[in-house]
């Protein structure tokens, strides 16, 4: 799906908006609602204002049902924060940037400037939320990029096509999540445990592309997961992005194809 240039310019200006926003250290609970019934009408506005929590008292952003078309950035200072949707079917964070789009300099923005949700913070939790990139089958288009450590996802959906979920580094846990895409839709150098998750391949390609560093004991581990492949398509479980790639499927259901 093509986007208007104004939408792209707004997306690329996200970093400047974040820099101008002032975090409120005392704000540890916030409600996001599109209809104005909460504290904020956008997830990004709440993220920019929420304070850093603690292990015993995490900060929490509650997101009411709705489709939130925006880009969200959780910088490193947003540690011990929970982002909780009402339910993943009806609470959707979505954007449509893709690698071939042109930036302000006239050049393609590239893969790593496309994520709908860019997460740099450690000790972050996301629950009951759909995170989507709806650019379509136009090349690399990330739904989420995770650069923090100890990030937990529960009952979430990650929807896209190529490069849906990028786990750059750190250690992460996915429970009861759905991840959908076409090519390399789980990729990166992180250590990540996926428990009771569904992986849905929309086209013939590769599900994963790990770039596990040589010093890491594990890369991607899928335990009790289900792999579903679209009718008439054939997919591989993975391919190495770099040397030492490590991906393991155990006690999982592997669909035909």
Where are these regions (language model features)?
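Bacterial N-terminal signal peptides
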Residues: 7-17
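Positively charged n-region of N-terminal signal peptides that target proteins for export
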Residues: 1-4
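Sequence-level preference for short, compositionally simple segments enriched
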Residues: 22-257
């Amino acid at each position: 799906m093509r986007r208007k240039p104004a939408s792209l310019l707004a997306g690329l200006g996200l970093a400047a908006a974040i820099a101008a926003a002032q975090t409120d250290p005392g704000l540890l609970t916030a409600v996001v609602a599109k209809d104005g019934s909460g504290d904020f009408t956008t997830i990004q506005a709440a993220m920019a204002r929420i304070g850093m929590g603690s292990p015993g008292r995490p900060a929490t952003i509650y997101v009411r049902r709705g489709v939130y078309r925006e880009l969200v950035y959780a910088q490193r200072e947003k540690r011990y924060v929970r982002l909780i949707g009402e339910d993943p079917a009806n609470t959707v964070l979505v954007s449509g940037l893709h690698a071939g789009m042109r930036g302000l300099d006239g050049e393609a923005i590239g893969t790593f400037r496309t994520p709908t949700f860019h997460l740099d913070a450690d000790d972050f939790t996301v629950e009951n939320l759909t995170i989507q990139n709806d650019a379509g089958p136009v090349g690399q288009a990330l739904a989420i990029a995770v650069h923090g450590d100890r990030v937990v996802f529960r009952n979430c959906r990650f929807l896209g096509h190529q490069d849906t979920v990028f786990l750059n580094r750190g250690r992460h846990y996915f429970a009861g999540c759905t991840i959908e895409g076409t090519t390399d839709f789980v990729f990166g150098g992180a250590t990540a445990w996926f428990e009771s998750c569904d992986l849905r391949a929309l086209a013939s390609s590769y599900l994963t592309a790990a770039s596990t560093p040589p010093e890491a004991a594990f890369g991607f581990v899928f335990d009790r997961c289900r792999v579903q492949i679209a009718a008439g398509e054939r997919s591989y479980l993975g391919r190495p992005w770099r040397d030492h790639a490590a991906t393991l499927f155990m006690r999982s259901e592997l669909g035909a194809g």
